[in-house]
């Protein structure tokens, strides 16, 4: 039996679509029918996963927000959020270094409005922020899980790192964007948690991803598979490279793995 961890964006779905291909859904159905455990392992928080995604095909569990929330068969096993004190320190540093971010929580997201916005990039995102009905920073209670942040110059994010490196980890998503998570949490720590919980040996773990925030789980899992559309770092890290997400990448990955065999 294998336990297989799937990223979402660029791995299960592509191009801004929330729809999985028929070959992806069928591959997951067959793998589960053959006794293997299939789990989502994503940077998205629970609010951004939604039933329109998980309702397309059944998964055994969800590892969410880069390891900050874990569910198995609908039961929440753990959930890490920022404290009010940590939240205050984060917002203070963002203002100090002119860093914009969406504060991502399990139930609500928070985004800058008006004078809270520092960068042109986020000003251009104002309509999207309005459409998604993000709440204001001022209403953030502190119990959000992670941040998706942007700084127009490297100095801005460097300042955040200097001030907050004891409580935060920073994942470079390129072009000035960063995923920022509580210190010590990642897709790899999520795998460690769930495999310890289920008492599954490491040699049975498989991770499939495409982007830099997948690197921790790809390096941690016994077997790592990169989508054909992966970043350079991911392609250099993986044990196997499958085809692109829109070219039956998941089907071909699971076929190579042998979990589709009867």
Briefly describe each language-model feature range:
Residues 19, 23-118:
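Active-site phosphate-binding/coordination module
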Residues 35-39, 59, 145-147, 203-205, ...:
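Short active-site oxyanion
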Residues 55-58, 65-66, 163-167, 220-221, ...:
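Short, structured coil segments at secondary-structure junctions
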Residues 93, 97-100, 104-217, 229:
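Conserved acidic, metal-coordinating active-site core of Asp-based
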Residues 56-59, 79-82, 118-123, 187-189, ...:
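Short, hinge-like loop/turn segments at secondary-structure boundaries
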Residues 1-3, 21, 179-262:
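Mg2+-dependent phosphoryl-transfer enzymes with acidic/Ser/Thr/Gly-rich catalytic loops
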Residues 2-17:
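Asp-based phosphoryl-transfer active-site loop
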Residues 59-65, 80, 170-172, 224-228, ...:
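Short hydrophobic/aromatic-enriched beta-strand-loop microsegments
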């Amino acid at each position: 039996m294998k336990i297989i961890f799937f990223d979402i964006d660029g791995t299960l779905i592509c191009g801004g679509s929330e729809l999985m291909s028929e070959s992806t859904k069928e591959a997951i159905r067959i793998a589960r029918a053959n006794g293997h455990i299939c789990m989502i392992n994503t940077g998205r928080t629970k609010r951004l996963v939604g039933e329109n995604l998980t309702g397309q095909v059944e998964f055994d569990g969800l590892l969410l927000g880069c390891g900050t929330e874990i569910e198995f068969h609908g039961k929440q096993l753990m959930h890490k959020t920022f404290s009010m004190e940590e939240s205050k320190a984060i917002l203070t540093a963002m203002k100090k270094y002119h860093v914009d971010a969406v504060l991502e929580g399990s139930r609500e997201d928070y985004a800058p409005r008006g004078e809270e916005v520092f960068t042109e990039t986020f000003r251009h995102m104002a309509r999207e922020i309005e459409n998604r009905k993000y709440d204001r920073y001022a209403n953030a209670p502190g119990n959000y899980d992670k941040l998706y942040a942007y700084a127009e110059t490297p100095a801005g994010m460097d300042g955040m790192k200097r001030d907050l490196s004891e409580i935060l980890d920073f994942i470079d998503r390129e072009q000035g964007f960063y995923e920022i998570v509580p210190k010590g949490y990642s897709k790899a720590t999520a795998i460690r948690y769930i495999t310890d919980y289920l008492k599954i040996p490491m040699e049975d773990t498989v991770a499939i991803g495409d982007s830099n925030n997948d690197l921790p789980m790809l390096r941690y899992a016994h077997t790592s598979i990169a989508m054909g559309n992966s970043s350079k770092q991911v392609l250099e890290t993986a044990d196997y490279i499958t085809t692109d997400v829109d070219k039956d990448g998941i089907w071909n990955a699971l076929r190579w793995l042998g979990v589709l065999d009867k």
